[in-house]
């Protein structure tokens, strides 16, 4: 994967808004169906992945248990920036990975807690908009009230 102008702009933006070694999450546009993600971003930007599940693979990070752990990692590491890369979302391999797993809790978490701050072709950079209070606990309390 070569670093082109879009990637350079994305890296520069994150470097200007975070500290070296700070955790950021570089994910896919959607996490219920995966092809690949841009893990080179972590190396180029000199930023850390907040979770051991940074290399996204169908059948792993598309499961409820792993997405739940990823959410807990994003919360516990106080990740303020999330990068959603939509480049490979439409890729459909000739196997079961072309179908949605139906698990969308990571995307729901990102949508509920991060707001768009910058965009580039196929890339959206989001900034944390809510406090780090434990998303599952807030979600459970909200469901009890309803």
Where do the model's predicted regions map?
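Soluble or luminal CAZymes and related metallo-dependent hydrolases
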Residues: 2-9, 62-66, 98-102, 106
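Short periplasmic/luminal acceptor-recognition loop of GT-C membrane glycosyltransferases, typified by
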Residues: 2-60, 70-71, 79-92, 120-128
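Aromatic/acidic, Gly/Pro-rich catalytic loop(s) in extracytoplasmic/lumenal soluble domains
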Residues: 81-146
């Amino acid at each position: 994967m070569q670093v082109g102008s879009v990637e350079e702009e994305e890296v520069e933006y994150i470097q200007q808004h975070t500290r070296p070694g700070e955790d950021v999450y570089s994910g896919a546009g959607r996490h219920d169906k995966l092809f690949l993600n841009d893990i080179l971003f972590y190396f180029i930007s000199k930023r850390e992945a907040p979770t051991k599940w940074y290399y996204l693979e169908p059948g792993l990070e598309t499961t409820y248990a792993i997405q739940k752990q990823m959410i807990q990692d994003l919360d516990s590491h106080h990740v303020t920036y999330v990068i959603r890369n939509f480049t490979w979302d439409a890729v459909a391999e000739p196997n079961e990975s072309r179908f949605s797993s139906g698990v969308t809790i990571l995307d729901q978490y990102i949508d509920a807690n991060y707001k768009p701050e910058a965009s580039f072709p196929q890339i959206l950079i989001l900034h944390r908009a809510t406090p780090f209070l434990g998303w599952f606990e807030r979600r459970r309390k909200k469901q009890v009230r309803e």
